[in-house]
Design a protein with these regions (language model features):
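Hydrophobic transmembrane alpha-helices
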Residues: 7, 11-56
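Structural signature of hydrophobic alpha-helical transmembrane segments
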Residues: 47-60, 106-114
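C-terminal ends of transmembrane helices
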Residues: 64-75, 121-130, 180-183
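Interfacial aromatic-anchored transmembrane helix boundaries in multi-pass membrane proteins
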Residues: 69-85, 91-92, 96
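Cytoplasmic-side transmembrane-helix entry/capping segments in multi-pass membrane proteins
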Residues: 77-88, 106-112, 133-142
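Short helix-perturbing small/polar motifs within transmembrane alpha-helices
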Residues: 86-127
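Hydrophobic alpha-helical transmembrane segments in multi-pass integral membrane proteins
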Residues: 93-106, 147-162
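Small-residue-rich transmembrane alpha-helices that serve as helix-helix interface/gating elements
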Residues: 113, 165-180
Length: 192
C-alpha cells in the first residue's frame, strides 16, 4: 500500500512535469520514506496524547529523530516493522522513564559511554545512503554535538521535570542500543 501511494504521487509529479521520468525510482523511495516517517511519528504522537504523556513523547521524538538522522542505526526490512520497532522503542522509553529517575551521575556515565560509542560507530553505513568520508566525519561530529546537547538538556530538566528528563535519558540509551545492534549485524555480515 505504501508503495502504491508513493507510486501515485511520483506519477503525478511526472505528469505535471515537475520531475523527469529517470528520477521515478528515487522519488518513489523518497515518498515511501516520508510516508513511513509521518505514519510512525503520528502514531507515536497519538499514543502520547492518549496516554497523557505529551511532553515525554515530544522529548522522545526530538531526541530519537534528530540523533538517528546523523548516527544511523538499526533499519528494519519493512516499513511496517520499522513502525513497530519505533513504537516498541517509544513504549519501552515511556515505561522505564515513568518508573526510574535519573541523576547527574547517570547522565555523566551515559555521556562518556555515548561519546565513545559515537566516535567508534557513528555514522552507520546504509546501502541507500551513500556518504563520502568528509560527510561521514561531519555526521559523526554533529551526532556527538547533538548527543552532548541532549545530555545537557536532560540534566537541566532534572530540576523541572524528572519524567521528561528520564525520557530523554532513556531515548539516548535506545539510540545507542540501536546503533550498536546495527553495527554488530554489519560485523557479522562481514565475517560471513
Amino acid at each position: 500500500m505504501l508503495n502504491k501511494i508513493a507510486t501515485i504521487l511520483t506519477k503525478k509529479l511526472i505528469l505535471n512535469k515537475t520531475i523527469n521520468e529517470e528520477m521515478f525510482d528515487i522519488y518513489v523511495y523518497g515518498f515511501e520514506l516520508l510516508i513511513s516517517f509521518l505514519f510512525s511519528t503520528t502514531l507515536v504522537m497519538i499514543c502520547g496524547v492518549i496516554l497523557n504523556r505529551l511532553l515525554q513523547t515530544i522529548a522522545f521524538l526530538c531526541v530519537f529523530i534528530l540523533l538517528r538522522s546523523f548516527t544511523g542505526g538499526y533499519h528494519a526490512k519493512t516499513y511496517f516493522f520499522c513502525s513497530f520497532v519505533t513504537l516498541l522503542t517509544y513504549g519501552m522509553v515511556l515505561l522505564v522513564s515513568s518508573f526510574i529517575q535519573v541523576s547527574l551521575m547517570h547522565y555523566l556515565l551515559i555521556l562518556i559511554i555515548g561519546i565513545i560509542l559515537l566516535i567508534v560507530f557513528a555514522p552507520i553505513k546504509h546501502p541507500n545512503k551513500k556518504t563520502i568520508p568528509r560527510q561521514r566525519l561531519r555526521h559523526k561530529i554533529i551526532s556527538i554535538i547533538l548527543f552532548c546537547f541532549f545530555v545537557a538538556v536532560g540534566i537541566w530538566l532534572t530540576r523541572i521535570s524528572m519524567v521528561v528528563s528520564s525520557a530523554i535519558f532513556f531515548t539516548l540509551i535506545a539510540d545507542l542500543v540501536l546503533l550498536f545492534i546495527k553495527n554488530r549485524k554489519e560485523i557479522k555480515n562481514e565475517d560471513s
